[in-house]
Amino acid sequence: MQTSDEEIQKLREHILAEIDLTREMSDTEIRAIVSEKCSIYGKQKFLKLSEQEALEQYLFHSLRKLDVLQELLDDPEITEIMVNGAEHIFYEKRGQLFESDKHFTSKEKLNDVIQQMAGSNNRMVNEASPIVDTRLANGSRVNIVLQPIAIDGSAISIRKFPEQPFVMENLIRFEAITEEAAEFLKVLVLSGYNIFVSGGTGSGKTTFLNALSQFIPREERIITIEDSAELQLIDKPNLVRLETRNANTEGVLPITIRDLIKTALRMRPNRVIVGECRGAEALDVLQAMNTGHDGSLSTGHANSCKDMLSRLETMVLMGMELPLPAIRSQIASGIDILIHLGRMRDKSRKVLSITEIAGYEENNIILNDIYRFKEEKAEENTVHENTVHRAMEKVGDLIHTEKMIRAGYCLDGL
């Protein structure tokens, strides 16, 4: 038997009437009330046990969780969820996009869920501030755009992360990087090289930054700086996580990435990790890298290593009018290694290049490719002519080895 939206809403109102609003009730207490009411309703309507259980789950999620989104959030194989108004919900599973058969019962219910998401992280979203980035309790990143900025209805984009963050061994197993290249990066991190990770949307930058951070020695003091906290550093006891704050209509001032970088440098860090450079804070990141904070890590959106350098120049100019040669000199002296990630046609994510910034000459930054991902089709008129050979190959050697030598590491085999 199919229960109508109207009947579900009435049942929900009966359950709400039973909830004691004078105190905070636990999930167990709420679930018990839901179960009791659904049991009575199920007997009256001759529901099958499976139908009653599905109804209980739906009502509990609508009261205590994130309504129809909760089932998608609980599925470990789903990586992204997109809500386009109350009627349309899409999700990405195993690299493919699907439309959900679920929808919100009304625009009001969608807005209730939006307020719940924003409020859980002390963020405010309303007509005065209709766009907000936030995160869920499980670490998922959320972007919200309210109607009428989102013309066809309020939009939500959720990027999920695994409960247990990927370590480099996972990425090797998924063939995102070779064991040899991963070992090379491990030595670079241990030696205190400043590393910048670039890639397009969904290329795995945050995941890779997590994996790189795994190599940081346990005893070092690490400060992470993010718009919305996403990094999940494992077994790092001396870790301080900083997160930006938006301004609101009550006069609370914003706290920006730039503010947090300046604060972090006064906190005696061994390493500063900036989740993503998007604007004028790029200048502060470069200055941190150039003032003795070796081993710093960050990421940025770009289509290649060269494109990342151009974008960094533009971002620095957002914060201060500096001559281009001065900016390029800062980049060349601050960043040691560029790692570029990409998403392939088969939806897999790969490390496409590991490149050293080798120097700065005649107003140009000199790049030295060390590893590069190659994709070659087999020769025609052979048995394997439709086969594509894909592998990461070593194409050069590290030029600047001073940090590695000071840290006591040998280049043999790297």
What does each model-found stretch correspond to?
Residues M1-V125, L136:
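N-terminal accessory targeting/assembly segments
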Residues D75, H88, E92-S191:
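P-loop NTP-binding catalytic core
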Residues Y193-I195, A211-G334, H340-G342:
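Switch/coupling sub-region of P-loop NTPases
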Residues G199:
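The Walker A (P-loop) glycine that initiates the GxxxxGKT/S ATP-binding motif of P-loop NTPases
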Residues G202:
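Walker A (P-loop) phosphate-binding loop of P-loop NTPases
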Residues K205:
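Conserved lysine of the Walker
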Residues F208:
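Hydrophobic positions on the alpha1 helix immediately C-terminal to the Walker A/P-loop
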Residues K347-L414:
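NTP-binding/hydrolysis catalytic cores, primarily Walker-type P-loop NTPases
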